[in-house]
Amino acid sequence: MPQKLHIDVETYSSIDITKSGAYKYCESIDFEILILCYAFDKGPIKTIDLLQGETIPQSFLDALIDPEIEKHAHNANFERNCFRAIGYNVPIKQWFCSAIKSGYCGLPLGLGAVSEALNLQDEGKLATGRALIRFFSCPVKPTKKNEQRERNFPIHDLEKWEEYKRYCQNDVKAERKIGEILKNYDIPKFERENYILDQEINDRGILIDLDFADNALALDEVNSEIVGQEMKQITKLENPNSPKQLKDWLGNQMQTEVKSLAKDEIPKLIEEAGPGVVSDVLNLRLRASKTSIKKYVAMQKCVCYDGRAHGLFQFYGASRTGRWAGRLIQLQNLPQNHLAELDKVRSVFKDGKYEEVSALYPDVSSTLSQLIRTAFIAEPEHTFAVADFSAIEARVIAWLADETWRMDVFNSHGKIYEASASQMFGIPIEKIDKSTEEGSAIRSKGKVA
């Protein structure tokens, strides 16, 4: 009996996987597997051309659901979702991902990048794939030249189609070769369990209050228009949102070259300009450039039929450290909120019109940014519990380094950031008060340390 089943698929869906993720991509009504390539152990790679009428062999399906046979794929989450979409919900524990194995070994996650790093050459991922995926696996824009069709099929370029099948075959070859090269570097049981947990978390997803997200974006659209009109009225620019036009205007007003309108540069420009029309425009620019608002757009794009966003974490996504990385909405990078009456504010922004909202909370974009966390909700009759380990990195590093004085801090008052800053700058710890501007600035330096 074979021990391993190596799999790769090429698929079609009208959903943009880069913006919506694999879960929503696979649940699209037009999702289908176009090509299936697979191999048992070191056996020959078999290619099934599903789009041209071939069917998946029963021997493959039997192996797919056999708990004794390991399923191997590069980025196995995708293949697992693909087969679940066509009725084969293979348990996570049966899947093994060569991308995760690569990440564990300090290599890139992408199949092409790993192929290059390991010098797989002819056995590596083919460079032709990106263009072929765009041609066969994505919708195309109807034109007179393509006879107004919205999708390409093999009949539209048989040579490319054969090349696409070879590309899929090579992905199986590359995945299998990576496994052979890294066979002596077993993922520890603890990390394997973490991977399975990661997949369970991604499968479960998180419930999104879409009504709230939709209204938030509607409010932001009105706010952006109003702020833009205010900037236009003051500056007389044709397009005050254009960085070049605005930099030129600011340069003329301030009699100096303005090189950047980056978010962290604007407060410096405001301080340099002082009170007046320039500061007014720069403050409007800050209000109009809250990039975090785009997270509401990401919610809309990736939420699935069950009202949840799935696939928000990438196991071993950070190079070198192997930490989890965020995907799609980027849950690990959410704006803080400092709103005193959070529930009340949220209620107003969920149901209110712009006139009502802006009258109560004039800085609409800032408030919307602070409300992003509240778009994630519990399902009915459940509680959404939010927990965080206090200064967890500082605690673990102190313990690993056997740094006694830091562990003593945690065993007493626990103010590690203040204690670090005290040692750095020779300031008594009791004088570092985070409620004051100076104390907060000093404490933040201790936090970095």
Predicted regions and their residues:
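Conserved, non-catalytic sequence blocks in retroelement Pol enzymes and Pol-derived host proteins
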Residues: Y104, A387, D408-S412
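Cytochrome P450 catalytic domain signature, combining two hallmark sequence patches
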Residues: V90-I92, Q255-L261, D343, A401-S412
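Conserved "right-hand" nucleotidyltransferase catalytic core of DNA-directed polymerases
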Residues: M1-T11, I15-I17, I35, A117, ...
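Ser/Thr-glycine-rich phosphate-binding loops at phosphate-binding pockets of nucleotides
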Residues: V9-I15, K24-C26, N75
